[in-house]
UniProtKB/Swiss-Prot annotation:
Transmembrane among keywords: yes
Membrane topology: Multi-pass membrane protein
Naturally occurring in which organism (per UniProt): Haemophilus influenzae (strain 86-028NP)
TM regions (residue ranges): 23-43, 62-82, 97-117, 132-152, 179-199, 206-226, 241-261
Protein name, entry field: Phosphatidylglycerol--prolipoprotein diacylglyceryl transferase
GO cellular component: plasma membrane
EC number per UniProt: 2.5.1.145
InterPro entries: Lgt
Keyword tags: Cell inner membrane, Cell membrane, Membrane, Transferase, Transmembrane, Transmembrane helix
């Protein structure tokens, strides 16, 4: 082991547990909770602006549905995208949520389903809902990556950069990229800033959602080059995460082009 690199302490992933059980509050769960609290604060603030088109009750319904979408979609996505073999051998693994395992792409699918249902029940345009939700997401994503870092999971590839870190649960104790922190910065702070600056200017409906898909897809695709793959690469070229990001980037670009082609639907 090279002493020139920072050796991280072994963080306890649980803040507390109930007795000898595995049930309790984990840092990762706390990050999700803080992300939703911040999202509600920001959403209510925007809903209270004149002519926002939203009431606080509608926001709460949307966020509750979104929370369920993230939780169910994130868990199912992690199992089917990254741990399908484990699930086929032990189907009850899907329900052991206290062991961790959440997929962003699965959570995104869950949120989209929740937005479709909420838009239908509130009789509003889906893209109005998607544009309202998109700027709320990145801050929570960043906190989630901090949770990954505390859990000492999803670390990066081996490297010799000066800021490399050694994760104590790495059997090889190699200096690695702190890829969780890269993602927290790019997918969290940077994407949050981009979207919340973008919505301050006139723009066509659906453009905010399209920009979110492009921004997340590009940032995640880049970081995947220094993140240790969870599963084998596709054809030895790209990782599973990069393969899942490509449809996001392409879809986001298509949505942006379509949105700007509809010149009459400009939101000020």
């Amino acid at each position: 082991m090279n002493s020139n690199y920072l050796l991280l302490p072994h963080f306890d992933p649980s803040i507390f547990t109930l007795g000898d059980s595995n049930i309790g509050l984990r840092w990762y769960g706390l990050m999700y909770l803080l992300g939703f609290v911040f999202a509600r604060w920001l959403a209510v603030r925007r809903a209270n602006r004149p002519n926002s088109g939203w009431t606080v009750d509608q926001v709460d319904t949307l966020l509750f549905n979104g929370f369920m979408g993230v939780f169910i979609g994130g868990r199912v996505g992690d199992v089917f995208f990254y741990n399908l073999d484990h699930f086929l051998q032990e189907p009850l693994y899907l329900f052991r949520v206290w062991e961790g395992g959440m997929s962003f792409h699965g959570g995104l699918i869950g949120v989209i389903v929740a937005m479709i249902w909420t838009s239908y029940s509130q009789k509003r345009n889906f893209w109005q809902t998607a544009d309202f939700v998109a700027p709320l997401i990145p801050f929570g994503l960043g906190l989630g990556r901090i949770g990954n870092f505390i859990n000492l999971e999803l670390w990066g590839r081996e490297t010799n950069v000066p800021w490399a870190m050694i994760f104590p649960n790495d059997p090889l104790l190699l200096p690695r990229h702190p890829s969780q922190l890269y993602e927290a910065f790019l997918e969290g702070l940077v994407l949050f800033a981009i979207l919340n600056i973008f919505i301050k200017k006139p723009r066509p409906m659906a453009s905010v959602a399209g920009l979110f898909l492009i921004g997340y897809g590009v940032f995640r695709f880049i970081v995947e080059y220094v993140r240790e793959p969870e599963v084998e690469n596709f054809f030895g070229i790209i990782t599973r995460g990069q393969a899942l990001c490509l449809p996001m980037i392409i879809g986001g670009a298509f949505i942006m082009a379509w949105a700007y082609s509809r010149k009459s639907a400009v939101i000020k």
